[in-house]
Amino acid sequence: MEYKRADRVADLLRREMADLLLRRIKDPRVSKVTITAIEVTDDLQNAKVFFCLMGAATEEEKRSAALGLNRGKGFMRLELGKRLHLRYLPQLSFHYDSSFEYGDKIERLLKELHKNE
């Protein structure tokens, strides 16, 4: 299977965004954010950034984190532009990744089934 350029750019973006969130972004709304995946379109114009929150998160915390990420989008693109030497930097859109919550729910159900046996 071929490793497309969009996949390489997505991996690079994920690493750099994680570093930005850890070291440069000071907004408390995004302090618990973890970047789980990034999907970049083949034309490298758009990137969907999937994130989750460490620990149990309420709906309000999820909305607050999404708002914080969207408010810092311009700063992140500026910093990513300095770090990455790409002709065009994709437009970023942030999406909450609920797959970890779903996996946790399935795991709890399986444990409950084994407990009842």
From Swiss-Prot:
Keywords: Cytoplasm, Ribosome biogenesis
Any GO CC annotation of this UniProt entry: cytosol
UniProt subcellular location: Cytoplasm
Keyword hit for Cytoplasm: yes
Name of one Pfam family that matches: RBFA
InterPro entries noted in UniProt: KH_dom-like_a/b (IPR015946), RbfA (IPR000238), RbfA_dom_sf (IPR023799)
A biological process from GO: maturation of SSU-rRNA
SS bond list: none
GO molecular function, one term: ribosomal small subunit binding
Xref: HAMAP family: RbfA
Subunit structure, as described in the record: Monomer. Binds 30S ribosomal subunits, but not 50S ribosomal subunits or 70S ribosomes.
Primary role: One of several proteins that assist in the late maturation steps of the functional core of the 30S ribosomal subunit. Associates with free 30S ribosomal subunits (but not with 30S subunits that are part of 70S ribosomes or polysomes). Required for efficient processing of 16S rRNA. May interact with the 5'-terminal helix region of 16S rRNA.
Family designation: Belongs to the RbfA family.
Name of the protein described by the UniProt record: Ribosome-binding factor A
